[in-house]
């Protein structure tokens, strides 16, 4: 690290460690909070460490002559809207490619291969709708395109939540096709809109911020949605076991941890044959209840993102102003 007149000119290792450490502590705290409790000192310490490391990252960036991230960009609503669009797309659409197969396995009893095939409606619309988006972009503004894509994602997730609560594959397939359509519309536009907000000589920084936002959103979404799924599934299973099989309440944590991971067989191993006949349907119902909650939250977040992004991105592009500066 080099210091010149009290100003840090090269702090890439510190910035990288601070940002990575912040994400690590936040995700760690979110995931473990459901196991050890949200009111424990360890959970508070992890989340607080994540916030402090993020503050350190911002402070170090502001002290540099040539910062890795130009924080002045965040003064422009359109740039903030473009980043929020990427965050919402990754956190509410892309992450579903990881989470939805768990429902096919645990909720509908599909094999791993059948679950992969069951995701085809999502994949097909995600692959075909970028071409439709190219044509729509001639008629709609970037703000409208982003809002439309996120609205489709939100509606698809809400329809998926309804389909999960109803049961059956056909309605679920139609719902995830809507989510895939929204993801397809957003796939090319998200990074393009971010790049359009910065001068050409800062294109590398914009590309890095776009990629960082994408993967940060995916990691945080998996942590948050995973914690939400585990928490609601555990609550639902505890209530069911208290009514139907109180003798197996001690196995609740083990059963939920394995079911949420997609391994129903391992979840049932500690139980006797007779107990499995009672507990397995209860575990399946608890998982479905928790998964439906996750989809409701993801759907509402995507719709909120559509509103915010559609509003913020109607502001003028700041690239010309930044170039002049």
What are these regions (language model features)?
Residues 1-10:
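Single conserved hydrophobic/aromatic residue that forms the stacking wall/gate
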Residues 13-19, 27-28, 39-49, 53, ...:
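Transmembrane core module of solute transporters
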Residues 17-22, 46-52, 295-309:
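Symmetry-related core transmembrane helices of the 12-TM Major Facilitator Superfamily/SLC fold
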Residues 23, 98, 130, 218-223:
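Glycine/proline-centered helix-kink
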Residues 32-37:
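Short, hydrophobic transmembrane alpha-helix segments
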Residues 66-72, 237-241, 317-325:
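Short, Lys/Arg-enriched, Gly/Pro-containing loop segments at transmembrane-helix junctions
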Residues 85, 209-213:
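Hydrophobic alpha-helical segments of secondary membrane carriers
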Residues 214-311, 324-325:
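Hydrophobic transmembrane architecture of multi-pass small-molecule transporters
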């Amino acid at each position: 690290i080099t210091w010149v007149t009290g100003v840090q000119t090269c702090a890439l290792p510190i910035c990288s460690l601070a940002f990575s450490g912040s994400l690590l502590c936040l995700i760690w705290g979110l995931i473990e909070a459901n196991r050890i409790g949200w009111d424990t000192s360890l959970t508070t310490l992890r989340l607080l460490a994540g916030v402090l490391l993020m503050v350190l990252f911002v402070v170090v960036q502001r002290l540099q002559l040539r910062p890795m991230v130009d924080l002045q960009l965040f003064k422009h609503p359109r740039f903030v809207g473009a980043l929020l669009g990427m965050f919402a797309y990754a956190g509410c659409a892309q992450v579903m490619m990881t989470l939805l197969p768990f429902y096919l396995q645990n909720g509908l009893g599909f094999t791993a291969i059948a679950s992969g095939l069951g995701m085809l409606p999502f994949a097909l619309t995600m692959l075909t709708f970028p071409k439709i988006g190219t044509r729509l972009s001639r008629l709609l503004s970037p703000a409208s395109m982003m809002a439309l894509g996120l609205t489709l994602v939100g509606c698809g997730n809400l329809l998926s939540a309804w389909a999960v609560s109803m049961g059956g594959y056909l309605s679920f397939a139609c719902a995830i096709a809507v989510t895939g359509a929204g993801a397809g519309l957003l796939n090319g536009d998200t990074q393009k809109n971010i790049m359009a907000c910065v001068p050409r000589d800062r294109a590398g920084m914009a590309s890095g911020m776009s990629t960082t936002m994408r993967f940060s959103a995916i990691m945080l979404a998996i942590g948050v949605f995973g914690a939400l799924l585990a928490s609601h599934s555990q609550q639902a299973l505890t209530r069911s076991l208290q009514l139907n099989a109180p003798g197996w309440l001690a196995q609740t944590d083990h059963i939920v941890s394995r079911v949420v991971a997609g391994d129903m067989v391992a979840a049932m191993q500690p139980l006797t044959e007779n107990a499995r006949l009672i507990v397995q349907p209860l575990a399946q119902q608890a998982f479905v209840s928790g998964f439906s909650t996750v989809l409701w939250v993801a759907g509402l977040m995507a719709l909120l993102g559509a509103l915010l992004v559609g509003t913020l991105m109607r502001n003028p592009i700041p690239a010309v102003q930044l170039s002049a500066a």
